[in-house]
Amino acid sequence: MARTGRRPGQTQTREGILAAARNQFAERGYGGATIRGIAAEAGVNPALVHHFFGSKDQVFVAALNLPFNPSVLVDSIVEGPRDQIGRRIVRLFLGLWQHSETRAPFLALLRSVANSPEVAQQLRTFMETAVLAKVAAALNLPTLRLTAAASQMMGLAMVRYVLAAEPMASASDDEVADLIAPVIQHYFDA
């Protein structure tokens, strides 16, 4: 008789869901993958995917080992005085790169995006829907402005952390924030 109900072993079940999610995201991209599809491939009920991860965004973050929670990221950007958004974004971004446990996945992701159109498409779709569109809606701004700000931050990451170009690579976070925050703020002041 076939077993019904929950699979034994939380860790095995969670890892099985993550493996299925990686396959679904690889085959269908972020936009085409669904919780139901991930659950079907993992052989579990969709409710179990929600139990472990909460949302498709969170499954994606876990599957790609992204070192941030998109909901927390959005809240951190939109909460607080609007005239300080540029500084908040730069500080938040620099903070994510300070620790090896978050820096390593970011470096791997940046290098993967540069070499894999599939990974680039998945990350782009995820960022557009899970971060940029939500920030744009919360602040009543055109998405183009958020995309421009994101491009500045990606450029900063490439120069400071991937290329390690001096003097940007060794500048203090305060120096970088003082230099870059006004540029980012410009996109939010329209």
Regions found by a protein language model. Name each.
Residues 120-125, 135-187:
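Hydrophobic/aromatic-rich alpha-helical bundle segments in the mid-to-C-terminal region
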